[in-house]
Each structure stands twice: as structure tokens, then as C-alpha cells.
Amino acid sequence: MMDVLMYLFETYIHSDVELNVEQEKLEDELLKAGFHQEAVYKALDWLEDLARLQDTDEHARVATGTSTSMRIYTQQEIDGINTVCRGFLLFLEQIKVLTSETREMVIEQVMALETDELSLDDLKWVVLMVLFNVPGQESAYTQMEELLYTSDVGLTH
């Protein structure tokens, strides 16, 4: 599913191509591009869920946390998001790319991927897609885009 999402993002969203394609035509195009039908459906559902997140106040209550608040992950989140990725999310909060609200959106979208092994690169793409879909996050999106295309993100030990 991640391959389909990245393809859609790079082809339509990131390249400023107008996405006025009917879902059926888009599905056909993705199938012709070689993606499996199940992955296509899951990716389109994932994007619909992401769009729905920006239209709700579901995560607004999270934004009231203070800058000294620490996110405690559930066991399911720990199982789905490895230590490196959780550390990267914390790093993004510390450098103000993510707010507590956008972090929660990212975590929700990552968990919706239903992947066995989330890579750091996949996480970066999810963060970029979330920030792209949240109004007022243009600066954070630009910062994240720079982090995505650079291999050394300053995570030294």
C-alpha cells in the first residue's frame, strides 16, 4: 500500500497535477501501473481517512498539551512503530515540524497502514502526506520535505 501512496503523492499531489480524476479511472490507472487491487483500495481508503482527519476536531483536544508533555505509546503502537521511528517523531516535535495534533494524525495514519515493518523512509512519507493535508502547515511541510530528501537528518548519538 505504501508504494501506491507514494506513487499517488508524487504523481498527482506533489507535482501540482490537478486531481480531478474519477475514483474508478484512478483505480484503473493504478491497476494498469501494476499495483495490486487490494493495495489500491487500501491506499484510496487511507487517503480518504486522511482527508477526513483535517475536517474534524477529533485531534483538537490533543493540541492542548504543553511543550513538556510526553507521548506515551500504547502497546499496539509500540508494536507497529519501532524505536527509531518513535524517536524520529519526537525529533520532529522538538524542531517544531510536528505539533501534538499533527503527531497524533501521523500516528493514526501509520497505524492504519497495517504494515509489519515501518521503515523510517515510510514514516517520513506519511508525515509529509499528513502535513500536506493540514491547512497552515506549509512551513512544516517545507521542512519535512527537506528532511525527506536528505539522508542525514541530524539524528546522531
Curated annotation (Swiss-Prot):
Family that this chain belongs to: Belongs to the Smg family.
Protein name: Protein Smg homolog
Domain of life: Bacteria
Organism this protein belongs to: Aliivibrio fischeri (strain ATCC 700601 / ES114)
InterPro entries: Smg (IPR007456)
A Pfam family this chain is assigned to: DUF494
